[in-house]
Amino acid sequence: MAHPCATDPELWFGYPDDDGSDGAAKARAYERSATQARIQCLRRCPLLQQRRCAQHAVEHRVEYGVWAGIKLPGGQYRKREQLAAAHDVLRRIAGGEINSRQLPDNAALLARNEGLEVTPVPGVVVHLPIAQVGPQPAA
């Protein structure tokens, strides 16, 4: 099974910069993408994979994207404190101190579902007759 970020990397690591819209529209589009990525990460990625992603983001000083359910704010100077705080959380996730699903923001995001369409999993229910015990009449 591929991790969700491997199937649609633009959702996790891209920035909608080529659509010709203004800055506010781009920021809204980026926020929507990041929210969808966080929900998918938190729901579909195993905890071990989230820890690996967090470790990678910390080791490589990543500034953008969604890693282990944490949205990084970017590399702008004015966001350096937010980035440092996010890296601290990622360090703790990577070290196994915390579970990203249990962080207050992530738990709330999962609880309210944020409009993400969940693909239903088809299921089949088969009803079998109860086996008769004892001698069977000859046909």
UniProtKB/Swiss-Prot annotation:
Cofactor binding mode and count: Binds 1 [4Fe-4S] cluster per subunit. Contains 1 [2Fe-2S] cluster after reconstitution of overexpressed protein from E.coli. Following nitrosylation of the [4Fe-4S] cluster binds 1 [4Fe-8(NO)] cluster per subunit.
InterPro entries xrefs: 4FE4S_WBL, Whib
Post-translational modification: The Fe-S cluster can be nitrosylated by nitric oxide (NO).
PROSITE patterns (alphabetical): 4FE4S_WBL (PS51674)
Up-regulation conditions: Maximal expression during progressive infection is between 2-4 weeks, however low, stable expression during chronic infection.
Reported phenotype of the disruption mutant: Not essential in culture. Gives an attenuated infection during both progressive and chronic mouse infections. Mice infected with the disrupted strain induce a stronger host immune response than wild-type. Growth inhibited by S-nitrosoglutathione (GSNO), a source of glutathione and nitric oxide. Mutant cells are less metabolically active. When chronic infection was reactivated by corticosterone the mutant strain was not able to resume growth, suggesting that WhiB5 might be involved with bacillary proliferation during reactivation.
Superkingdom of origin organism: Bacteria
A GO term, aspect molecular function: DNA binding
Cofactors required: [4Fe-4S] cluster
Alphabetic keyword roster: 4Fe-4S, Activator, Cytoplasm, Disulfide bond, DNA-binding, Iron, Iron-sulfur, Metal-binding, Transcription, Transcription regulation, Virulence
GO CC terms: cytoplasm; peptidoglycan-based cell wall
Pfam families, sorted: Whib (PF02467)
UniProt-annotated binding residues for [4Fe-4S] cluster: C5, C41, C45, C53
Keyword 4Fe-4S in record: yes
GO biological process: regulation of DNA-templated transcription
Residue span, 4Fe-4S Wbl-type domain: 4-77
UniProt similarity note: Belongs to the WhiB family.
Function in brief: A transcription factor that is probably redox-responsive. Probably plays a role in immunomodulation and reactivation after chronic infection. Its induction results in transcription of a number of genes including sigM, and the genes for 2 type VII secretion systems ESX-2 and ESX-4. Seems to negatively regulate its own expression. The apo-form has been shown to act as a protein disulfide reductase. The apo- but not holo-form probably binds DNA.
Name of the protein this chain belongs to: Transcriptional regulator WhiB5
Organism: Mycobacterium tuberculosis (strain ATCC 25618 / H37Rv)
